[in-house]
Amino acid sequence: MSQTHINVIGAGLAGSEAAYQIAKRGIPVKLYEMRGVKPTPQHKTDKFAELVCSNSFRGDSLTNAVGLLKEEMRRLDSIIMRAGEAHRVPAGGAMAMDRENFSQAVTDEIHNHPLIEVIRGEITEIPEDAITVIATGPLTSDALAEKIHALNGGDGFYFYDAAAPIVDSSTINMDLVYLKSRYDKGEAAYLNAPMNKEQFNAFYEALISAEEAPLNSFEKEKYFEGCMPIEVMAKRGIKTMLYGPMKPVGLEYPEDYKGPRDGEYKTPYAVVQLRQDNAAGSLYNIVGFQTHLKWGEQKRIFQMIPGLENAEFVRYGVMHRNSYMDSPNLLEQTFATKKNPNLFFAGQMTGVEGYVESAASGLVAGINAVRRFHGEEPVIFPQTTAIGALPFYITHTESKHFQPMNVNFGIIKELDGPRIRDKKERYEAIAERSLKDLEEFLTV
């Protein structure tokens, strides 16, 4: 096979990152994206790296594993991290973006790169003319999904993922909410809608009896724990939401709060948080309220939240099926397939879960596709780093127990020596070692 370029299929977070990493190393890229010609059920635009679910890249501190992964990616010149930094919106200790401007920035940089040729159209066969990175995501078209399914030995893994509703901020009753971040961490970035016990109980009863949109009859309900529909969470017990998205701790009433309080308590019984969704502050999403309720039910029940009694929903919550591969049996730690070293996969379909993790997999796959192009040995990042631990986990866990995985400190190699008992200090030490090891690895 005469090598002239590398194919990347899919211009989501992973595909955009892979294409950029390949092109910056001087190799021409053919980037295929079907949106703009053929839509998916969940994407709203034809822009690259569209944020379909939340607009958050989660925690930014180095004592948070995803914060460490983001810092590692910054040091590896990630296009996704650069665009994210350029279009941040207030989110306390988290990193959130104006989703439209973020996607537009990635799209523009990819389109303007002289070595990247963007081809709009559906790919129905796995290309054999060049080294290829497939990053088509959980919403892969049926035709290509069949070919990937065949690689998977006919076994399909999937789970259901859901998105939260977005409301027009001008329709929020600001007298009943207050601006605050949990524990006052970072700037005051969230609108908080407090509930007393009576309000919460009424909300809970409405939620567990609400009508859900139907699934296909042959599909079981399997959810990723990190993006579980609020109604499914509620059915696990009346207290479940109080330890999850409606957790009130660290969100005390401000002294000047004029709305109804929960008796003499300083902290509400429950709190619903809303996070800014765009730079203008005209849109807010309901944090942790991903849902599969019918749209009429969403309006009826979510307008029970104080401050949202007259809210206009610019997007209702939706749910979609996410497919992922049997990565322990199919993939090398480099994201190349075991049977064909010229074929790479990246993104959520490999079993990494989350925006940042998907982009990180594209970064690693892109680098290794270039090394394959040059006939060089692949790069395997140290297990002491977040960007090395994640591919190690998804390719070395036991296949029958394989589930999508967010980055976390539990998958990063333990520190040498006695275990540090204080969790924050332990995570700080792991992060310090990770960044040191990454720098040393990059200079070899």
UniProtKB/Swiss-Prot annotation:
According to the lineage, what is the superkingdom? Bacteria
Please state where this protein is localized.
Cytoplasm
| Listed cofactors | FAD
Q: Name one GO biological process term.
A: tRNA methylation
EC number(s) of the enzyme?
2.1.1.74
State if NAD is listed as a keyword.
yes
Task: Enumerate the residues binding FAD.
Answer: 10-15
Gene Ontology cellular component annotations, sorted alphabetically: cytosol
Q: Name one Pfam family in it.
A: GIDA
Task: Quote one Gene Ontology molecular function term.
Answer: flavin adenine dinucleotide binding
Q: What class of enzyme is it?
A: transferase
Q: Name the reaction it catalyses.
A: uridine(54) in tRNA + (6R)-5,10-methylene-5,6,7,8-tetrahydrofolate + NADH + H(+) = 5-methyluridine(54) in tRNA + (6S)-5,6,7,8-tetrahydrofolate + NAD(+); uridine(54) in tRNA + (6R)-5,10-methylene-5,6,7,8-tetrahydrofolate + NADPH + H(+) = 5-methyluridine(54) in tRNA + (6S)-5,6,7,8-tetrahydrofolate + NADP(+)
Q: Which UniProt keywords apply?
A: Cytoplasm, FAD, Flavoprotein, Methyltransferase, NAD, NADP, Transferase, tRNA processing
Q: Which InterPro entries match?
A: FAD/NAD-bd_sf, MnmG-rel, MnmG-rel_CS, MnmG_N, TrmFO
NADP as a keyword?
yes
**What role is this protein assigned?**
Catalyzes the folate-dependent formation of 5-methyl-uridine at position 54 (M-5-U54) in all tRNAs.
Q: Which family does the UniProt entry place this protein in? A: Belongs to the MnmG family. TrmFO subfamily.
- Name by which UniProt lists this protein: Methylenetetrahydrofolate--tRNA-(uracil-5-)-methyltransferase TrmFO
Instruction: Give the originating organism.
Output: Streptococcus suis (strain 05ZYH33)
Instruction: Provide the gene name from the record.
Output: trmFO
